[in-house]
Amino acid sequence: MGVPYVPVIGLVGTDLLKRRDDMVLAPDPFGEGKVTVVAKAMRPDVAVFHVQKADRQGNVSFGYAVEAVILAEASEHVVVTAEEIVDRITEKDAVGAFLPSILVDDVVHAPFGAHPGGLTDRYAPDAEAMKEYVAASRDDASFAAYLDTYVFGVSGHDEYVERYVRKARQPEPVA
């Protein structure tokens, strides 16, 4: 969005400002003497999203909240992985939020790209795989072992899907 800061609701009077150097109190330009908290705007280098559908030009249909579009607008680069690549998506065709191709740097076809999480209207989370992920996240050594197996231990996305999104563990479609 290109703004240097954004107002943040609900933080006036909290001690969070004592611990954060990226938030300050500022005069509310519309509040007649009131103050508001403003936070330095984020400018991520890259935002990566996994979506239900995208087209070859980079137009994207998000099946979830518009906040993802705001993050894409704030980012220097946007990479989208998609369950399905179609010939053309227009804003009228989009289910949920729409991200225009002008904001997208690359689109990658990646079925089950949200695994072990779920994807709205496509598949539910893989409960067993999520339990394993949560357990591995408890300490650095366990998480390093998890990454060695599931990220660095496969040659790419196709091998990951073949090995770990097995028919027996494949999540059921969400109605």
Predicted regions and their residues:
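Conserved alpha/beta enzyme-core scaffold
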Residues: 1-175
